[in-house]
Amino acid sequence: MKFHIGVFLLALAAGSLACAPASNDTAETAPEAEPVREVLTADMQAALTPEQVFEQLKAGNQRFVDGQLTRRDYNAQAAATAAGQYPKAAVLGCVDSRVPPEIIFDQGIGDLFVGRVAGNFENEDLLGSLEFATAVAGTPLIVVLGHTSCGAIKGAVAGVELGNLTAMLDNFDEVLAQVREIQALGTTDPEEAAVIQAAIEENVRRTMNDILERSSVISELVQSGDLAVVGGVYDLATGLVTWMES
């Protein structure tokens, strides 16, 4: 009896193998796209309009959200940009580790100038950097990029005091005052979502306006049509950038 059971089990196993689908090793698969090695050149940058770059960043962010990031040969791009750079956009963003501009906009080496400070506000140093990026290096678009649940804004709402952080958070006093005036919100609760989100958005708008007011170099480029300044807020949960009107 044991012999017959053993023969039956062997036959059953053999039948199962015969009916099993072909392994992945033999299945046909679509060829994987070659990684991008090319970088922006001076001629390519010069041909870009602010509107075209804006659309490219929107499309790149959507690829990021969809999990369809472009494959890139970063070693090749690093070598290709060693002698010069011709970025398409300059991003003024927050230092938050969860908001890397090159990744969330699906851009490669040499595509973006990036200046970062907690709370993505402008100061003399960052204005000078943006003037270099635009007037000297030819970048046609400036992006002011905030993000949800910004720790700097939360700290300002809570009135945090800590070393040099205290002076930095003072940059948001006018933003918070305007938000509370508009929304008639008197709370100082750092977890008050309405205050925090409104302040994040207002801070982006104010930074955009301050860049134009404080830099004649940049404002003249905007007036001539060679440059645009846009702003958006990145959602930490979804990865999507919501663009704002100035």
Question: Where in the sequence are the language-model features?
Answer:
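Bacterial N-terminal signal peptides that target proteins for export
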Residues: M1-F8
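Conserved functional hotspot residues or short segments at active or partner-binding sites
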Residues: V144
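C-terminal motif of bacterial Sec signal peptides marking the signal peptidase cleavage site
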Residues: G15-A18
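Acidic/His- and Gly-rich active-site-bordering loop/insert found
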Residues: P101
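Short helix-loop-beta junction
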Residues: I104-V114
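Divalent-metal-activated hydrolytic enzyme cores
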Residues: A20-G84, I109-G110, G119-A137, K154-S246
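Short glycine-enriched loops at secondary-structure junctions
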Residues: G93-R98, A118-F121, H147
